UniProtKB/Swiss-Prot annotation:
Gene designation per UniProt: srb-2
Protein family: Belongs to the nematode receptor-like protein srb family.
Single GO term (MF): transmembrane signaling receptor activity
Protein name: Serpentine receptor class beta-2
Bilayer-spanning residue ranges: 27-47, 62-82, 108-128, 146-166, 194-214, 246-266, 288-308
Taxonomic superkingdom: Eukaryota
Gene Ontology cellular-component annotations: membrane
Claim: Transmembrane is one of the keywords in the record: yes
Topology class, membrane: Multi-pass membrane protein
Organism expressing this protein natively: Caenorhabditis elegans
């Protein structure tokens, strides 16, 4: 190893030391670790107690289960990897020990990237499934749970293929100090892919809004033609699931949109704005918005489901009732007495 290589090695170790012990960076690492630890049981309970018992069609239910399962795995990965960032600096014997081994970084970074992008691409399946459900209103309740799994495997396959395209030439030979930082050589194609996913999420959100408007008009017109209870229930189910997935998509769009805009902003203004490469690297290494989403979405989801359940119960109580007065009330009374005596005579 020549003198220049030794100097570069020492500079990398010094950089890792100054960034790791920077107050803002340490607080951000600790925040991500704590939030992810809290998100693990919260997401698990939400998935088991709220998502799995939902009376939705199997296709949309499968999509929701896979989405929140991916969020759960993502939170576990964040908690595990950021525990390394929080704990390792307390026991190092050399500044160079702060540099993550390339093999460990490769596994950790690619795993985080995969599940973060799965969270972004999965809501597209919500919209596709909802549009198909609306187009097959009369018969969708009898459709088997096939579309949901098909969409999940297709979207994950697309995500894997695009990520392979982004990282196919990456050697992972740099010095890495954070699992959340994308290698410089892959940063441009990764940011491009991230922008494409963000545009897709925005388009998906707009499509969801249009879908709800179309559904409300379609529902009113369709109920005049078809008054069967099963069709009424299916139309209401489509409305409820669409509103819930819209809330999930919008919440994710807020957090991921902010993360992406902040990341691009930091890269655009460069290190001169931050007064040096250390502060610039710290700004790039702060990774708190997406982990915070994993915890926030639990409370948003619980609130949304509770509100929709309460509204549905109020609608049932106000609209589904047996009149007890007037001519219709008299007929209902006579029918009830007749049904009672018919039952008694049979027994």
């Amino acid at each position: 190893m020549n003198h220049i290589q030794i100097l570069e090695y020492e500079n990398e170790c010094q950089l890792a030391n100054e960034v790791t012990y920077h107050p803002v960076y340490r607080i951000a690492q600790l925040w991500t670790f704590v939030v992810s630890i809290l998100a693990i049981p919260a997401l698990y309970i939400f998935l088991m107690k709220r998502i799995l018992p939902l009376p939705f069609h199997g296709n949309i239910k499968f999509l929701l289960v896979c989405y929140f399962s991916a969020s759960f795995v993502f939170a576990v990965l964040l908690a595990f990897l950021f525990s390394y960032h929080v704990v390792a600096p307390l026991f190092i014997t050399s500044m160079c020990d702060l540099i993550i081994r390339p093999s460990l970084y490769k596994v950790g970074n690619l795993s985080l990237t995969l599940f973060m992008t799965i969270q972004m691409i999965m809501p597209l399946g919500f919209s596709i499934e909802r549009f198909i459900a609306l187009s097959m209103t009369k018969s969708y309740e009898n459709v088997r749970t096939f579309l949901g799994p098909l969409l999940v495997f297709t979207l994950i396959g697309i995500d894997l293929a695009l990520l392979y395209h982004v990282f196919r030439d990456e050697k992972f030979e740099d010095s890495f100090i954070s699992f959340a930082l994308v290698p410089e050589t892959s940063a441009i194609p990764f940011n491009s892919y991230f922008w494409e996913l963000l545009y897709a999420e925005i388009g998906n959100f707009i499509c969801n809004c249009i879908f709800l408007l179309v559904h409300s008009k379609f529902k009113a017109r369709f109920l005049h033609q078809q008054r069967s209870l099963s069709v009424r229930y299916l139309l209401e189910e489509i409305s409820q699931t669409s509103k819930f997935t819209l809330i999930v998509s919008f919440t994710h769009l807020l957090f991921v949109g902010w993360y992406l805009i902040a990341t691009i902003f930091v890269r655009t203004i460069g290190e001169d704005f931050f007064g040096g490469y250390i502060h610039y690297t710290v700004a790039r290494g702060v990774h708190i918005t997406v982990p915070t989403y994993n915890l926030t979405i639990v409370f948003v989801g619980i609130k949304a489901l509770s509100f929709m359940n309460l509204r549905r119960q109020n609608n049932v109580q106000s609209k589904v009732q047996i009149r007890s007065t007037g001519a219709e009330g008299a007929r209902n009374y006579e029918d009830a007495i007749a049904n009672y005596w018919n039952f008694v005579s049979r027994t």
